[in-house]
Every structure is written in structure tokens, then in C-alpha cells.
């Protein structure tokens, strides 16, 4: 299983993990980090950080994972530090794209949604900068994205920045919880692996 999980991520484009259940996503990210020497983790939704502070993630080693949890208005000032940290890492995780918008919520008119397109453009530029940097170092970059519902003619499931992710994601995965101790990982698109479903044990998180 170690080799399969390591082979899942590519350095040729984004690796996108889709999810409905935040706990299922946490199961996967806590598992995948255990197979990499050092991880830079941008924790926008702070779930992973909360679990580590509560000692609920078994494989968490302080020196192996560099956590960044930027607040509103802090991201731009942290870019240099983040990029410097990535240089010494073997994996970059951005978790999650949905929570990226919380950093700019004051710039969004919640009634008209004016300002959304500007933030989407900012997010796309942010991802492209990190993607190109990671590609130059041959470091995989994993982004997580919660599926949401949008009503057009009918309700459909769609990820944040759907068009950008479709164009830039070389690997597309979907994780779902089967039980407290087991989760499924669907390989949707991959440059070398056929679509399939992996069954993984959740051995990295303590539930209290």
C-alpha cells in the first residue's frame, strides 16, 4: 500500500482531492503525509491543525510537518516564508480551496456575490505560482476541495474553481468514509493508473 499511495501523486500538475466529508479528507491527508519525508501544510480550514494540537493524529511529528494557518490579510506576507519552506519539503498540501475564500470574505458582497471573480483570480494566480515552483523542484502539490451544490436547472455537485482545476489537475481523487476505521479513495483521473477504488485503513487518527 505504501508504494501505491506514493505513486498516486505526480509532479507534472495539481493533485486534487475532492470530498464531501471533512473527516474523510482528514483521514487521507494524515495518511499521505506519513509517507513523505517532510510536508509543508497550508491549513486554511484549520481542521488538521486542531487535530494535531489535540494529539489526535498518531503519525504527526512536529519536525516533519510545517503548518501554516494564515488569517485574513496574512497570506501575502507569508508567501516568501512558505516558498522557502517548500524548498526543504517533499510534499505541499493546500487544505482547502474552499476555505481560501474566508481570507478575503470582507471583499465579497454576500448578497450580489460581487468580488467572487476577483478572489477566484487571486486563487488561480496563487496556485500557479506554487505549482510552477513545485514543478521546478519536482515536489508534488496536493489541493483539497469540498464538493458543493449549485442550482442551475437542477442541483449539481461542483468543486470550487471547477474550470481551473479541470485544466490544471493531472490527478483527480475522491475520498469518502466507509466507516470510522475505513475510507475509500476513488482514482478518477491519473496519467498512469486506471480508474479504480482503493480501500484504506484509518490508522492515523485517534477518536476520543
Residue ranges, per PLM feature:
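Conserved beta-strand segments of the P-loop GTPase G domain that flank and frequently precede/overlap
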Residues: 18, 42-43, 67-69, 93-95, ...
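Conserved RecA-like P-loop NTPase ATPase core
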Residues: 65, 130, 169
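Conserved catalytic network of the ASCE P-loop NTPase/AAA+ motor domain
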Residues: 9-10, 34-35, 59-60, 84-87, ...
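P-loop NTPase motor core
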Residues: 84-164
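Conserved nucleotide-binding/hydrolysis micro-motifs of P-loop NTPases
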Residues: 45-48, 71-75, 98-100, 147-150, ...
Amino acid at each position: 500500500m505504501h508504494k501505491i499511495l506514493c505513486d498516486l501523486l505526480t509532479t507534472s500538475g495539481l493533485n486534487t482531492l475532492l470530498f464531501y466529508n471533512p473527516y474523510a479528507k482528514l483521514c487521507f491527508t494524515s495518511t499521505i503525509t506519513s509517507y513523505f519525508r517532510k510536508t509543508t501544510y497550508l491549513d486554511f480550514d484549520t481542521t488538521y491543525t486542531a487535530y494535531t494540537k489535540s494529539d489526535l493524529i498518531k503519525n504527526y511529528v512536529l519536525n516533519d510537518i510545517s503548518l501554516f494557518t494564515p488569517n485574513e490579510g496574512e497570506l501575502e506576507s507569508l508567501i516568501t516564508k512558505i516558498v522557502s519552506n517548500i524548498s526543504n519539503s517533499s510534499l505541499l498540501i493546500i487544505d482547502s480551496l474552499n476555505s481560501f475564500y474566508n481570507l478575503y470574505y470582507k471583499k465579497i458582497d454576500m448578497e450580489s456575490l460581487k468580488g467572487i471573480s476577483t478572489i477566484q483570480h487571486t486563487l488561480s494566480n496563487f496556485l500557479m505560482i506554487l505549482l510552477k515552483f513545485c514543478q521546478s523542484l519536482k515536489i508534488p502539490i496536493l489541493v483539497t476541495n469540498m464538493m458543493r451544490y449549485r442550482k442551475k436547472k437542477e442541483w449539481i455537485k461542483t468543486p470550487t474553481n471547477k474550470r481551473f482545476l479541470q485544466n490544471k489537475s493531472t490527478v483527480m481523487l475522491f475520498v469518502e468514509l466507509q466507516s470510522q476505521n475505513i475510507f475509500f479513495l476513488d482514482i478518477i483521473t491519473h496519467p498512469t493508473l486506471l480508474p479504480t477504488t482503493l480501500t484504506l485503513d484509518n490508522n492515523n487518527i485517534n477518536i476520543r
